[in-house]
């Protein structure tokens, strides 16, 4: 009975329970619907803001460290934004402030990249370069003082003059000082062709010959016009000048066949065996067997004959040193340009014993002294002029054919300009040496006479400086 009563009570309570469940179910549906509709506004906004704050917490800490390194103000603002993330309104404000500061956070990153290379840093490196170049150029044309009279030059003066002219006129290739004579008298005896051979180039020989002729003129008052013109010496003169150097060089050491032939041609006593034909570099073996015998003696080859000698000569055809003259027996012709190239190559090879451009002791008879061919006119120091005193000022006028010009191509006055100034013959005689101060002789311009010239000291001052030095100053 008790069981039945309990079952009845449970049946009675079922509608009540179902009603309770039904009412509870009906009350939660609008709550769920409201939750779904207003999730982002009321219930979910705080949670989402907190999630966003947590997500931005890590990069905020990183940015805070960067801002802390850069400036204290930025670190304070990052700390305040971090503390305001506890509330919904504070989190939205901090997130907006962070977004507004994001562009500013990127600004310090490129700035340090540009600061190490300011424009002022490169200027100190660029400024010294022109000063270095100017100092090098000043050193390259530093003044050189030598005696007024080239006849009084020492070997050191000759070397200083060659070095100065090389730098001043930018001679290329640079002349070898050892090619020039060490004696002043021998240097004064050089012809224009000798200067070509000493310089080793056309331009170098022309400029050195012209400048030295000017120095001789200012010392002696005598013009050396053949050394001042721009006409090239004929091949005979050049080859003959080179052959005289080989004679002065001596017979020791290794020597090439073409050098040996030039040695024989330089001595007129060998005319019965070999001689020049004309003045174009052509020569003829008068006695080819005698020439071959002498060549065998020089090379210590007693079996030498003309057949072997001619085969050796054919080797020079491809080198453009010499050629065979067709239609003439035992006749050959030197090619000066190929010969000079061979001389320069041999000199650069460091074999002074076999180089015709090696150490020079001028031939006692002077350059171009052959019996059948007179040498070109050049200055002879033994020819004196009583009205010219050494060291007196003279103005060179090498181009008499152009009186309208006030300055020659070398930078000195022409005859019309010189005639209006003090004449060499009118200059007072002086027993003491005077000076001539040359300032860049080849740079052009007219020369002036220093009015402060006295009877005891006369000077041709080209920069109107003091008249006290006793030397030529090549600037």
From Swiss-Prot:
UniProt note on tissues of expression: Embryonic ventral nervous system and 1 pair of neurons in each thoracic segment.
Record-level GO cellular component terms: nucleus
Disordered: annotated span: 42-150, 350-475
Compositional bias per record (Low complexity), positions renumbered to this chain: 70-108, 122-144, 401-436
Any Pfam family the entry gives: Ets
Feature: compositional bias, Basic residues: 375-388
Signal peptide (residue range): none
Stated family: Belongs to the ETS family.
Protein name: DNA-binding protein D-ETS-6
Originating organism: Drosophila melanogaster
């Amino acid at each position: 009975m008790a069981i039945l009563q309990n079952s009845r009570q449970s049946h009675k309570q079922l509608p009540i329970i179902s009603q309770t469940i039904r009412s509870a179910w009906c009350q939660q549906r609008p709550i769920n619907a409201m939750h779904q509709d207003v999730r982002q506004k009321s219930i979910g906004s705080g949670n989402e803001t907190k999630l966003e704050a947590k997500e931005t917490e890590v990069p905020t800490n990183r940015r805070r460290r960067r801002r802390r390194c850069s400036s204290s103000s930025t670190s304070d603002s990052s700390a305040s934004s971090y503390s305001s993330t506890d509330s919904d309104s504070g989190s939205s404000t901090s997130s907006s402030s962070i977004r507004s500061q994001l562009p500013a956070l990127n600004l310090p990153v490129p700035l340090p990249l540009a600061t190490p290379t300011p424009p002022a840093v490169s200027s100190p490196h660029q400024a010294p370069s022109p000063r270095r170049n100017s100092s090098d150029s000043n050193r390259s044309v530093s003044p050189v003082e030598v005696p007024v009279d080239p006849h009084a030059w020492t070997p050191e003066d000759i070397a200083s003059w060659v070095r100065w002219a090389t730098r001043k006129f930018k001679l290329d290739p640079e002349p070898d000082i050892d090619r020039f004579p060490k004696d002043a008298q021998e240097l004064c005896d050089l012809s224009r062709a000798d200067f070509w051979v000493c310089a080793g180039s056309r331009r170098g020989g022309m400029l050195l010959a012209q400048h030295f002729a000017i120095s001789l003129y200012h010392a002696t008052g005598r013009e050396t016009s053949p050394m001042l013109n721009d006409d090239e010496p004929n091949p005979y003169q050049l080859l003959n000048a080179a052959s005289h150097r080989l004679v002065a060089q001596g017979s020791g050491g290794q020597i090439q066949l073409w050098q040996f032939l030039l040695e024989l041609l330089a001595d007129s006593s060998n005319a019965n065996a070999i001689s020049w034909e004309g003045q174009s570099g052509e020569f003829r073996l008068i006695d080819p067997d005698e020439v071959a015998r002498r060549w065998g003696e020089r090379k210590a080859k007693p079996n030498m004959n003309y057949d072997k000698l001619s085969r050796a000569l054919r080797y020079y055809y491809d080198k453009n040193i010499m050629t065979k003259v067709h239609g003439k027996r035992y006749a050959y012709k030197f090619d000066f340009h190929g010969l000079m190239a061979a001389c320069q190559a041999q000199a650069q090879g460091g074999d002074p014993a076999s180089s015709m451009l090696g150490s020079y002791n001028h031939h006692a008879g002077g350059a171009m002294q052959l019996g059948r061919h007179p040498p070109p006119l050049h200055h002879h120091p033994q020819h004196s002029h009583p009205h010219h005193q050494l060291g007196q000022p003279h103005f060179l006028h090498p181009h008499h054919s152009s009186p309208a010009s006030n300055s020659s191509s070398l930078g000195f006055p022409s005859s019309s300009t010189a005639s209006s100034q003090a004449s060499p013959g009118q200059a007072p005689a002086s027993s003491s040496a005077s000076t001539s101060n040359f300032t860049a002789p080849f740079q052009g311009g007219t020369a002036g006479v220093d009015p402060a010239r006295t009877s005891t000291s006369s000077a041709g001052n080209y920069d109107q400086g003091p008249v006290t030095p006793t030397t030529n100053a090549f600037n």
